[in-house]
Amino acid sequence: MSDPQTHAGLIVPSVFYGLSEGSPAFAAVQALADQENVGHPLGPWFISDNLITFGHTRGFLADQHFVAAVLAARPTQAERSIAWRTHTLCWAAHSVASLPGDFVECGSYRGFSAEVLMHFTSGLPHRRFWLYDLFDPTGGPGEGSRLPDHSPALADQVRARFRAWDNVTVTQGKVPEVLAQAAPDRIAFLHIDMNNAEAEKGALEVLFERVSPGGLIIFDDYGWTGYRAQKEMADTFMQAHGLSILELPTGQGLVVKR
C-alpha cells in the first residue's frame, strides 16, 4: 500500500478479526469500510483492528515522527492495521524517557512493535531492549497460539532484524523460565503480549518488582473478549498490589507502577 505525501500521514487498512464472512456484522463493517477516505489519516473515520470511530482526529496518523518509525519497520497490512496500538507503545516509550530501567517485551513474534520503538526512540540510547518469545510454539501448556510466521527459523530472522542495534537482546524460550537466563534488574517499559494467562502471570511474578516507580506496563490482549483469562489474571495481580488497569479502546491495558 502506498502512502500519501509526508504531510498527510499513514494510511490504515480496514482489518477485523472474528467476523464470519457473510454475517450481518461483517456486511455492516464492510459497508462502513467502503466509504470514501476510510483509512486516510486526514479523514474522519478509523475502521480497523476491531475498532470503529468517527470524528476523532487520530493525530498520531499524521505525526511524521511516528509515521516514519512505522514505515521504517516495513509493516505488513496486518501491522498497519494495529497503528493505534503501536502508537500507544510509542507514547509509553516517550513517557518513561526520564525513568531508570530497560525495555522488555514478552511475546515479540516477528519483532515489528519492537523495531518501531527502536526507530521512534532513535535507537533507545543508554538502554537495552530485551525481547522474549518461543518463536516456534508447539501449543503446550503456558504457550500462546501458533501464528502464521511461527517457525524454527523465526528466532534467527528476528535477530537479523535487529542486527543494526547492539543494545537489543533476543532470547528464545518459554516465559517465565527463560527469564532466569537473562533479564534486566530495572525496567522502565514492560510490554506483555503472549496470548496466554499462565505465561503472562509468570512474567509479572518475575518482572513486576523490577519495574521502576512511574514505569509503564502494557498488556496487549487485556480488553479482548477472546482473552478474558488474561484480563482476570492481570486484574487480580494488580489489585493485590493496590493498582488498577486502564482498559483502552484498542483492547490494550495500561498500568502505571507506583
For the regions a language model picked out, list residue spans one by one.
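S-adenosylmethionine/decaboxylated-SAM
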Residues: H7, L51-R80, C90, A97-R258
